[in-house]
């Protein structure tokens, strides 16, 4: 007997069309079962089909979804989850048009967050991050990548990674940990970036032994780390058994996209300034282009990543919030979906695939997350919407009704608009 059976699902978005990364037309295709049903047992999906096919199934609880839509839990593959403080004091500078790199030089930007994170205890960081994770869950996210990078020293970086490990045990959302010690060059290492990177590399063996990080990332940008420094650093991390990511071409077109494809990074993120050659190389690689339009929006910039061109040329595109205290302080992945549709010229179908299938592959979770398939975790979202286009169309609010994580209700609105029923 099933534990739970969901019936009367108006649109069941399985996202289950083909294995591997989705590109071109596959990104613009959504497998939808009309009047669908999903069966759950021991936290695992055991039935996917139509309500007609589900007749005769026995379940301890049968939930009538009222003709509303059900999707997989969403995947946010790029966040800076664990940090201290906030940076609302920088809003005025941004409105005046002060460039981020200038704010950084004044001791603001990431350096401000670094100081607040250093001063916070691990438990304070955990409790703050739980608050943000709860919000992410309420927006339909069930898997999140979490970066360190607000320490720029060994003690604080360890503290961030240990906080993430504790959160993995204490919060329903699945977390994927990334070490971003190479997020900026500390003042004491100004002009000595190679020495700083070697210091970060020296931390990796113990980090690997303690399994505190799965990925290693670096901020490849003017005034921070060069393309050559980034490639050398990430290749050494790969030799130690880590998968790698790269903050690439966010501000200047340095060649970060090309570097990511060349070294086989799991993802290249931002890519606002990615060159035509970089896009071509990404299209011919298995590196996911994780686009972060919420950051461009919040920084009030006119030029967004060329998402339309990337998809048309065969790049596997994912979307993420880039949740962080400075350049994108939002946990709302649904808002990111809307911005991507409007500013990156992505279709609703492409947007949905970019926050499920491709985003899961960007963090090596393509075989366990992002799809509704028999044998996978029952990470499901019931939406207060009757079709998938409505979610990115009606922007600025959350359309989530209920979230199941491993078959258990992890979030629901104050009142449930569905009721239990029998077949």
UniProtKB/Swiss-Prot annotation:
GO molecular function: imidazolonepropionase activity; iron ion binding; zinc ion binding
BP GO terms, sorted: L-histidine catabolic process to glutamate and formamide; L-histidine catabolic process to glutamate and formate
InterPro entries in the cross-refs: Amidohydro-rel, HutI, Metal-dep_hydrolase_composite, Metal_Hydrolase
Listed pathway(s): Amino-acid degradation; L-histidine degradation into L-glutamate; N-formimidoyl-L-glutamate from L-histidine: step 3/3
Binding sites annotated in the UniProt record for 4-imidazolone-5-propanoate: 87, 150, 183, 250, 327
Coarse class of the protein's main subcellular location: cytoplasm
Protein's UniProt name: Imidazolonepropionase
Protein source organism: Bacillus thuringiensis (strain Al Hakam)
Lineage: Bacteria, Bacillati, Bacillota, Bacilli, Bacillales
